[in-house]
């Protein structure tokens, strides 16, 4: 089931201004990403805001940053 931007925002613990939610959509901070249908966004009812401030860690990222020595 899909919800409009206003409906999705109203279901959040702390509803934000509509412009803030639109900015989150443009910055890909909502997962799964909303679908643009004409003039409005449609959100999946299970969509959540993703926090981009958390550090990204992973073995591949470490290998890219440190070279082959990080693999072993």
Curated annotation (Swiss-Prot):
The gene is xis. One of its GO terms (molecular function) is DNA binding. Disulfide bonds: none annotated. Excisionase and integrase are necessary for the excision of prophage from the host genome by site-specific recombination at the att site. Pfam families: Exc. It comes from Escherichia phage HK022 (Bacteriophage HK022). Keywords: DNA recombination, DNA-binding, Viral genome excision. Transmembrane segments: none annotated. Signal peptide: none annotated. GO terms for biological process: DNA recombination; provirus excision. This is Excisionase.
